[in-house]
Amino acid sequence: VKTYLENDELNEKYPVYPFALRSQDGNATLTGQINYPETPAGVYPLVMLAPGSGMHDRHYLIGDSGTQADFVFSCLAQDFLAAGLAVLRFDCRGVKGNLRDNTLDSPEYLFNRELAYRQMFIDAAVRQTVTPQSQYEDLYTLYRYASELPHIDRHNLILLGHSEGTINIGRMVARYPVAAKALMLVSPVFSSMKHVLEWQLIHRTIAWLKAIPHTGDRLTLEDLKNGFGRSPLAFLQPISSLLPYKGYWDEADFDSMTARLQASFDTQRDMVLSHDDREPWPADAPFTQSSYAWWKQWYQNDQPEIEHLARCQSRVVCYFGMMDTQLNAAAEAAWFEGVKHRFPHIDITLLPDVGHTLGLHGLLGPMTESCAELLVRTAHDIVTAR
């Protein structure tokens, strides 16, 4: 198994240049770092890493293995650096650390680690300024900074986004003059934010129950037991929450489940949309993650995100994990087939047996070695191509 350098060791091996930039809206200081493959001399291609939803620092802790490989961006950075690319990583605004910080190992935080983390490492007032606009503006501030650095080859920049990071990259390139050589989008949203949330809250459980192998129009308890482990459902909820107490699920059950979930979604949507954009979501400090403006877009924005890439001058390389629990990857890919004549610059790759972070888990990392290798090889080919 490949071993990765600890976050500090990485900076000892690959020269690190920290930065602190004022955000465009003046509400935040954007912190992060660039590592170079060696002491910089001449210019280097650069890959800039943009994380998905949530409150992340530059290391992007999104794995569940308890190892260094859980820091998905630290590990990708190491692989890119070894391949000769410089790497920019940043902290989301208002985030000053991650849940594995050893300050939190103190016995007093044994039962409230999460709360202590929020109080020590999250600036709730700054998080309340997170909006759809701030997300892509911050990316542009970072992109502009990187493209003007003396040791960065501005004609050889790759923007790599994961999940919501792909949305923010798309929105940025649609609005600003961005001359990236390529966009690499991992688990991108081609459809709309609202479509994704409806899939998660209404349709996915039933779609995946129906996909479990069974005969006729009944899914029996036996079918469920036999097929559950191979279904993405296994990553979402225990089998005990899906037991058919009459011995089977049938079409009428699925219909009433859907109706119930749809009604619950509608109620939730009305509640969410009744809040002012500037209010803290989901609650006041220390629980603030963003403004309500950020959360509301998931209930009302039905513009297909792929449209932001329509006039993009860069090559766009996309990766979907077919065991993804967050996106309906097969449907996103099928939908792309219908519009791809308008997007000749976009390529998609479907990866079997991996999830949202291209790992074994349906949602979380670590990323598999073969997927990480694929990303690094692709990036290397892009920046070395004439």
Place the predicted regions along the sequence by residue.
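N-terminal cap/lid segment of alpha/beta-hydrolase-fold proteins
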Residues: K2-G42
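Short, surface-exposed "cap/lid" segments of acyl-processing enzymes
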Residues: T39-F80
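Conserved alpha/beta-hydrolase
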Residues: D70-R100, E108, N112-Q119
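Accessory cap/linker subdomain of secreted extracellular hydrolases
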Residues: D101-A125, T129-P132, Y136, V186-H308
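Alpha/beta-hydrolase fold nucleophile elbow
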Residues: I152-S163
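Short beta-strand/loop motif that positions the catalytic acidic residue
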Residues: C312, C318-F320
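Conserved alpha/beta-hydrolase "acid-adjacent" motif
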Residues: T325-A331
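Catalytic active-site module of serine/aspartate enzymes centered on a nucleophile-bearing elbow/loop
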Residues: D347, P352-R386
